[in-house]
Amino acid sequence: MSAADLIEERAAGLPAASIVRRPSLDEVCALAAGRTADLLVEAVDARGTGHLALTGGSAGIALARALPAALTAGFCPSQGLEGIHLWFGDERFVPAGHADRNDLLAAGLVEAGVPEANVHRLCGPERAADVDDAAGRLAADLAAAGPAQGRFDVVHLGVGQIGRAHV
């Protein structure tokens, strides 16, 4: 089976894509944050865990800032955010804490109640010999703690101003 056939087969059972427009980035982020929270609530209710892949860029940053309020509003106190796992759809191989790292977007979500242990970060050069070592460690983390069958509940994708997709 070719990769294209596999993608087509897996996509057949998924809801159809839709395009929703809003007049401002703030409104887009509020809508996306609310939908993200709804999907993660459903996942945690069904399986006890929910997996979210975040992205960077200006829209990804704005969305990450809107997420803590949406998640705390969406989850009842008895649920909490302990079942949420955060991953990063694109990341840079730079030291931990570097301003260019997208994993810094997790700070507000950790403050809201997502356990730090559930933030799955790419190792930087201070912990990994090279980018291949870092990727191997993240692959092992994904195999151990990632979503069943590799299906994330929500994946945020960004499209930069130059039309480059961040996947």
Predicted features, each with a name:
Residues 54-59, 157-161:
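Glycine-rich beta-strand-to-loop/alpha-helix junction loops that act as flexible
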Residues 1-52, 145:
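N-terminal glycine-/serine-/threonine-rich phosphate-binding loop
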Residues 165-167:
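Conserved small/polar residues in nucleotide/adenosyl-binding loops
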Residues 48-55, 153-155:
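Short glycine-rich phosphate-binding loop at a beta-alpha junction
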Residues 2-16, 78-156:
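Ligand-binding beta-strand-loop-alpha-helix segment within the catalytic cores
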Residues 67-75, 110:
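Active-site catalytic pocket residues across diverse enzymes, especially alpha/beta-hydrolases
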Residues 44-47, 73-81:
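Phosphate-handling active-site elements
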